[in-house]
Amino acid sequence: MDHNAALTTCSTSAIPRLARLATERIAELIENDALPEFDHKVIASCSNDIFEVLRQKKKLNHQTLQTMCSTSRFQINKIDLMGNKVELQDLELCSNQNLVSFRLGDIDYFPNTNKIQVADVLDTALNRTSRQQLRHLDLSGRHRITSNWPTYVARKLPRLESLAFANRSTANETLSQIGASLLNLRFLDISSTCVTDISCISSLRNLEVLIMYNLNILKGDVTETLSNLTKLRVLDISRKVNTDYLQETSQDAHLDLALGIYNRSVEAIESGTATPWAELRAIDMSGLSIVQFGTDRALAFVEKIIEAHPKLEQISLLATPLDSSLIEIPNRNLQVINTVSRRSIIFALSHYANLDRPAFITHALHSVYYQLQSGYDKFSQEELKECLRLVCISMQQGLNTLPVQIAGSACLYHLCKMKRIKRLSVKEVNNCIERSLDAAEQYRSMTQLQKNVWLTICNDYLLHLDEIDFYRTCKVALDTMLLNRDASVERMTIAIVSIVTPKMRPSEAKILTTETKYVYHLVKIMNDYLEAYTREHRVGHERDNENALYTLKFTLSALWNLTDECPATCKAFLDAGGVQIAFRILKAFDYHGNVQTKVLGILNNLAEVEELHLGQLCKNEYISVLISCLDGSFNEVDSKGRYREVERSYFAAGILANLLTNTDGWESENQRDEACEKLLELIEQYPTLPSAMVSYKSFIPFSRIVRESNSNGAIMWCLWGVHHVLQHREKNKAPTYEKGYIEMFMDSGLSPIVEDMSHGHSKHIHNLDIRVVHLAREIIDIVSCHSLSSSPVRLVRRV
């Protein structure tokens, strides 16, 4: 088939960039069932490209096939279903197109047997015109198929020139039928089948391409058989290898094809005649031990084959004794595929990336890895981009092969490591992330692979790009966290969750936070690392202590973000015993304001959920802890310019403000009054911060308190929070509100209430504290100035 052509060049797409973008966009519309109606017909080449994009994304299903095949809008003549879960009824849609090429893959169709019924499938998928004109048929795949299909093919597909059935458990009998009936074949791929004798194909004298990768030929005169195929241009006799030792993996005795070709080459040179393969352009000998020769003798062996075939343009010697040898033949323009240099390694990967050769792909990826590890700075920008593209293709095509994923993910780590990632475009970074996440999903329990993946993604630059799929990244990280308890993997996945959760769209975050299992697990981790930290702190293991603290801090950040405006997640945190653990952390880390701030942020989110009725937070013991967190040295600035003491106090105040609004549950009225007075006293002491300390998805956390509370202290906290984000609105955009904080304020319904408060009026508080009044006036002034300068917002002044 076309995709197996052995003569390759460094794969750069011939499709213009604009056409490629259009192709991908149309495929996306089809995938989302959002393709608009249009009258014109899309030509075959473009239709085929769109179909291929959907195939590579594994999005071929009944809906997408119906869109592409049921109407005459798309003119498809090549259909490839490999790697997609397609059922027999879906194949009926393919019959609406007139095809010249068809690749089946593995479908779930086993009526009364455990084999794919090839004749039924082809009858369903191919209409009369397709059967008359079909030239390429690929039946390669892993499932078993019926053995009598060559008879059907010979009878129904008269113009067939190219046939592949690699990886099927097909034996000599089927090949005999092909040799007897399909005499017009020019291309044949029988790789990794159960064929042990190829004598029967000597009748296929029109063959130009013969692919026999990983074939155990045990009998027959192979050299004589191949000698009858005088039109051969491409011959693949490569074998799967153990890439650690460069040895053929099969221990079975098999005929040495390379030795036969060598002997004929020597005979031809000595007699001054041509070999039977005078038209040979490419030969693949990768993985062969070359009859156990050493490097010098192996080189002489290969040179004889090259000398005897003057038209030879390409020879593949990957994973052979000549893998790292420089082979140059005077006066010959010969492409040697091995790993002798950086350029040849990239070429080798481009040659095998789209072929089903996982052992060779893995071998090439290992070589890429070592080049990146030891000589990254030697890569030109073009080489780097080509290398990245090929690694991603290899990982996508070899998703079911663990060695490919481990080697590929290691390459991606070196390509994205630290500042190196800035040499890549956003689209290339996205490609890295998608391939990494695919690997992480496929192999949850493979710790080394998981380390590679999360080391790659745990990159500050990468995680702050707006264009990446934060939802999928977070989801895969959370799932990995559940299933892989390696400490370093756990630490990285939790860190990533803590960073990307606030970047998700509200609809995506809502889907994710309905999975309460994540919260239960994070609460458990929170408890485990609290105990680990206190234990290591006691025995003086500073390094383990730092690791425990690092993980605990990111766990708290993740929970803080997951519980934000999400009642279901807050309830799960409560049910998992998170409140008790949170207060234990507050006590254990009374010297560590950053940790306390994160805990208080979580408790603040819980306190905002009115339906939870958090009376348990009003215990004297808990209230005392919260009040103690209010005080601090508010003018102190840390090395990063942050007012940590203000942050801690603000979130402690938020919890108390919510508890003061809910009058039930307080064990001591004096403690309640103390909390209210403390809020007024300390919030007034907050300095004007140079930058935003917090951001809000909405003003819902403030609305209920401002509307219902009879506590001056609670109102004071709300107004300070609103004032703070309005004050820094230019540089601190509302994360999920496109219009901005001024419009959020107006839409929240707070405006008229705050307007009343600025005049000293409140429905719920008889004596509104003057400090609250002053803060309300400052908010109204900010909104009024904005209204006058840049916005149609109007405030209604009440007197």
Swiss-Prot record:
Residue ranges annotated as transmembrane are none
| Coiled-coil portions | none
List the GO terms this entry assigns under cellular component, sorted alphabetically. Answer: Cul2-RING ubiquitin ligase complex
Against InterPro entries, the record matches this protein to:
ARM-like (IPR011989), ARM-type_fold (IPR016024), LRR_dom_sf (IPR032675), LRR_Zer-1 (IPR056845), ZER1-like_C (IPR055142), Zyg-11_UBL_adapter (IPR051341)
Report the Pfam families cross-referenced here. LRR_Zer-1 (PF25013), ZER1-like_2nd (PF22964)
Listed PANTHER family? PTHR12904, ZYG-11 FAMILY MEMBER B, CELL CYCLE REGULATOR
Q: What protein family does this chain belong to?
A: Belongs to the zyg-11 family.
Subunit organization: Interacts with elc-1. Part of an E3 ubiquitin ligase complex including zyg-11, cul-2 and elc-1.
State what protein this is by name.
Early embryogenesis protein zyg-11
